[in-house]
Amino acid sequence: RDLRMSRGLGDVYKRQVFTYQGDGDLASIGTAEIVHAAHRGEKISTIFVNNAIYGMTGGQMAPTTLVGQKTTTSPYGRDEDWCGAPLKVSEMLAEVPCSYYIERVAVNNTPNIVKAKKAISKAFHYQMEGKGFTMVEVLSACPTNWGLSPIKAMEWLEENMIPYYPLGVKKDKGAE
């Protein structure tokens, strides 16, 4: 839904637009919008915050929740046989011919935060040049719904999320 609204605003006001979406929105109810925006090569930048849980609605399992990760709706952990594998949105969108730039970063330590800032800047730069659809996936902690202290949440992200969701550029047509 964010992407449809963004396209409308961009078209009407002739401005660059971006969306800031969580995994519950983008990887669940908004999957159709993100896939088709990438397929159309929309000149929109998306900042996709992946904390592997529905953080704003009570800590339910999201499409990005890791196998074995406990949530309010999966108290014994996500079961891959029952719920499928966690969705790797960046890898999926990198395969779309009209996507221009896709990168996954994390904000769990200072060096990664610096890399995240550079990736977001690059996405916006490509958008301002009219290159097409860009997305930066940001792996982020959710200490409250993970039931962890902020420090433990950063460690959990490093030990569990980054191995499943490897950091790095997934597609960069500007570098080809």
Tell where the protein language model's regions lie, with residue ranges:
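A short, conserved beta-to-alpha structural element at the edge of catalytic cores
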Residues: 41-63
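Short gly/pro/ser/thr-enriched loop/turn and capping motifs at secondary-structure boundaries
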Residues: 26-27, 51-56, 143
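Conserved thiamine diphosphate
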Residues: 62-129
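Single conserved hydrophobic/aromatic residue that forms the stacking wall/gate
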Residues: 1-13
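A short, small-residue-rich loop immediately preceding and capping a beta-strand
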Residues: 14-29, 44-49
